[in-house]
Amino acid sequence: MKFSVKNILEMEVCLALGCTEPVAIALGAAAAATLLPGLKFDHIHLIIDPNIYKNGLAVVIPGSGGLTGLDTASALGAFGGDAYGKLEVLSSLSPEMVARASAFLAEGRVKVDLREESGLYVKTTISGGGHVAESLITDVHTNIVSLMLDGEEVADPRLVATEAMSTGNKLAELEEWLRSLTLEDILDLTNELDEADLDFLEEGVQHNLRLAEYGLKHGSGLGIGKDIDRLLKQKLLVKDMTTSARMLTSAAADARMDGVNLPAMSSGGSGNHGLTAILPIWAIKDFIETDRESVLRAIGLSHIITAYIKAHTGRLSAVCGCSVAAGAGATAGITYLVGGDLQQVEGAIKNILEDLAGVICDGAKAGCAIKLNTAAGAAVQAALFSLQGVSVKDTDGIIGDSTRQTVQNIGDLSNYGMVATDKTILKIMRAKHKKG
């Protein structure tokens, strides 16, 4: 089956309020809660996969007043989530809703269990008023495949995907098609972007810029972006392409990981991927002669490359997708924008994958801003090196003789080579959580 660039944007690029893993938990709880209108909840039981656990454990939830936690995300979704809002499920949280969820949590009414099998999985069971409601999300953060009340399936076409319309099934088909593409095919797709697509891409820029501006103004989270700005003013750093990309991208991550109530335009199922795929390209445009259309086409290319690599590595894994997938997307977009040809775009992708392939994902948290800072800077560097004729040789390590082969190798590293790494990361994080 052949897809179009519009299909990629529709399925891979969307607004997300808050980190997508706790948001998926909130969505599952909100969906189950719709089956118990007006009833007092007695208990919530959550069963999740290891990577949802890892990415949802420590990140601040928007609108919560600084709260974190898997159980918190579930309670907030149940008491204040809009099940029809998808990744913006928590956009209407009020202080009263947060207070009710907090009281529910304080009474120990939420239980979280870990599913050993990998693959995105969020099962939420809510009991109340003598009834039991259940939702199940699989494969994709918004893909509700089942809603049940007292053991009976509930049909809600606005919430529950049929097998034919399942986001998970459609995404699997899209990813299979993406894996068949060459870099030349991907560059051709960029030429198919029409004015409506460019407007949508520009909307994503504006959303992610708002996060960056907030981070720069308030020093949210770790304050990496604001600190870079301070170092520039102290003349300890020089404002160039690399520093500008790092500052803008990390500032947005600072704000997002601190739970600021502003949505991000996500890419490949992750808001932080969206920040990395978009903002470095936007930052470097001021250093070259270019125009709106060229910048937005470069960002479109970045999203496609991000989706292409995620189709190989998997939605969630031990590999930091901001570094490997969105970082590669950004460097491809930068190279394209500065005037690079097919060979130079390929060289830039090889450069950044050689540089950052070993960066692990140890969950979403404030420290992600440091990783996005690194990815943004490396994306600029990899592009500039390639434009100067410097690219990693095909004989080096995991680098292949083409972008396709290199990305396949990264996929093997992620899906097979780092399984034990992922388990070890999770073991360390769970031990810390139990101590806390």
From Swiss-Prot:
Cited InterPro entries: Ser_deHydtase-like_asu (IPR005130), UPF0597 (IPR021144)
Question: Taxonomically, which superkingdom?
Answer: Bacteria
Q: Per UniProt, what is one GO molecular function of this protein?
A: L-cysteine desulfhydrase activity
Coiled-coil intervals in this record? none
Q: Name one GO biological process term.
A: L-cysteine catabolic process to pyruvate
Q: Of which family is this protein a member?
A: Belongs to the UPF0597 family.
Its name, as the record gives it, is: UPF0597 protein DP0591
- Taxonomic source organism: Desulfotalea psychrophila (strain LSv54 / DSM 12343)
